[in-house]
């Protein structure tokens, strides 16, 4: 069929297989163009590896470190009437490129929150890694719901402010119209549910399961991802329900770091990454507008990075730099260091404060935001004829 972007409420519900493959190839080519990262990492497990920072992690690990990668993701294949999810095509594309380049990989389509999935991954890992242990574990799940198997309760994450109603400005990144944004405050159930889905509980369950199965190598590194952001997004992000979940994730990192040091001389870290376009960030009120302004400022300063540049830098400058892993006072790796640089944030804030509907296009690079968003779904890629039928 001919596949075109179909967007409802700023959510793209179609994906183009050839375009997704092209985007994966672009990321692979970026890593190939960089120096190899010196490390002893041979085996990596990436939980949530089909898009965004998880996919970029996998590509950087496979092509930057030359490691075997096992991926866990919860994606859907195509049906007669609809395309597969972007992550499904990303997984397929990565495997095809890896095979061509002689890099071993395995994709598992599982709900990572389930105990049965953890058991399945442990069983598969023992075979796939040929009895060797995992040197690097990446936890990059971004799911809206999680089932608590012990109670049968289904928890849903929400993006809400805490304490008072949020009123602010946002943008429709497709039409480039400024919007007034209003979000009612969270109740206790909203907070609890969001922490349950997006906090550190499941990360700890995975780490403990792998340690108990004796699958984590001596000196193994374990990384989960977080975000802090600027003052202007704090009410709806870092000081809201999502922020409570990130606080829990970061507290869990301290616990896991201690446990891994004691058991395998390993380490667990949270890496605080920069704001990028993801399927999630595109629907967070205020965030697309902030990202559009940030992109403009960082591009002008030669500091702009997407997911793949960030993940290569994580490996090359932070985790495997030949010395100590640089962390802040809370033991977090800071890949948002360029985003939160004083000169960058000052320019972003100045632009934010003088924003009007008339100067929006000058101040915010929404064209780049839109391109990144479309690329994630396999659209707007160079060299692809979107008028042609494609096998979905």
UniProtKB/Swiss-Prot annotation:
Oligomeric and partner information: Monomer.
Entries under HAMAP family matching the protein: FabV_reductase
A molecular function (GO) term: trans-2-enoyl-CoA reductase (NADH) activity
Keywords: Fatty acid biosynthesis, Fatty acid metabolism, Lipid biosynthesis, Lipid metabolism, NAD, Oxidoreductase
Reported function: Involved in the fatty acid synthesis (FAS II). Catalyzes the reduction of a carbon-carbon double bond in an enoyl moiety that is covalently linked to a coenzyme A (CoA).
Cross-referenced InterPro entries: Eno_Rdtase_FAD-bd_dom, Enoyl-CoA_Rdtase_cat_dom, FabV-like_NADH_b, Trans-2-enoyl-CoA_reductase
Taxonomic source organism: Brachyspira hyodysenteriae (strain ATCC 49526 / WA1)
A biological process from GO: fatty acid biosynthetic process
Family as reported in the entry's similarity comment: Belongs to the TER reductase family.
Pathway in which this enzyme or protein is active: Lipid metabolism; fatty acid biosynthesis
EC number: 1.3.1.44
Keyword Lipid metabolism carried by entry: yes
Active site positions, chain numbering: 237
Record site feature (Plays an important role in discriminating NADH against NADPH), residues: 75
Name of the molecule in the record: Trans-2-enoyl-CoA reductase [NADH]
Gene it is expressed from: fabV
Reaction(s) the record says it catalyses: a 2,3-saturated acyl-CoA + NAD(+) = a (2E)-enoyl-CoA + NADH + H(+)
Record-listed substrate binding positions: 227
Residues that coordinate or bind NAD(+): 74-75, 111-112, 141-142, 246, 276-278
Pfam families linked to this entry: Eno-Rase_FAD_bd (PF07055), Eno-Rase_NADH_b (PF12242), Enoyl_reductase (PF12241)
